[in-house]
């Protein structure tokens, strides 16, 4: 059975609804749907920019407004006006050639030397300038292909857009792997490789574990002198520290020099390289 609402509560609800609708209208908002049961009940409203969202009377009264409008207004506040942008470029002798939208949309500009440069204004404001003036020219397709050929690869591209783009190639030594990809940026720096060629750099004689691997010199020498020096020293003092008489965590030490210094001195006397 539905609970009957008293005349008092019904009147309060109607007053709240009227206040909410009036407040919405004052701020160019329209109530679309939803029953205003009380001040905490959310209803659907539309702002003057046709964004729809849900809000209750309590929050709207305290200043909560359309979230989409808030984001747009925030970005507009941060956006530099065109006169400010032009003056910043002019200070460095640059001329803007395309329409400025925002800091993160590409813009064309002409540097003091006459080079046309497409870039992000945000990078320019951080200090980045004309690539050609810095000598950072874009590779021609022929140069890009040569970079792959010089490494023993067969380039499979006839064009490219930028040096971070993954470009297709075949490895002459491992054709069976099929098409592989690497950016030109890494290829010219020797950072990109065929998958199998890369693995071969660390297998067989190239592996650190080849024929048992490489052991630490200090570890090898310590193990070598255990029977002839470490163990006899422990037995001499009945497996106790000569200073504290403790039997825990024992290590045999030289009084005058540590083991590392003795190793270096011995290798130096024998003319061995460390």
Curated annotation (Swiss-Prot):
InterPro entries: CapR_dom. It holds the Pfam family CapR. It comes from the Bacteria. This is SPbeta prophage-derived uncharacterized protein YomD. It comes from Bacillus subtilis (strain 168). The lineage of its organism: Bacteria, Bacillati, Bacillota, Bacilli, Bacillales. The gene is yomD.
